[in-house]
Amino acid sequence: MAYLSNLTLYYKPTCPYCQKVLAYMEEQDIACEMKDVTIPGVVDELVAIGGKNQVPCLIIDGQPMYESDDIIMYLHGLVAAEEIG
């Protein structure tokens, strides 16, 4: 799958829910902009976009999506659409 420029994933390397999303992305060869919230200033950027500092957070065309299962379900839909199309 190609690089998805309309997506940004905010994550924390030690977060098990983030690891779940990252593992799925790697398994499906999904790439997008990645932002590590442990880097100074990145969590403030996340809060400015979504109103909270919860990770993982997938930004889709500027709109936040939280919860690892929801993010994986969304990404699965993209993979399925690519396989069909």
Question: Where do the language-model regions lie?
Answer:
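Cytochrome P450 catalytic domain signature, combining two hallmark sequence patches
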Residues: 81-85
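Thiol-based oxidoreductase modules, predominantly thioredoxin-like and allied folds used
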Residues: 31-43
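A short, hydrophobic beta-strand/beta-hairpin element that forms part of a small beta-sheet core
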Residues: 56-64
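A short, Lys/Arg-enriched interface patch at domain edges and termini
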Residues: 71, 77-78
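Local sequence-structure signature of Cys/Sec-based thiol-disulfide redox active-site neighborhoods
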Residues: 1-30
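Thiol/disulfide oxidoreductase modules built on the thioredoxin-like
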Residues: 47-54
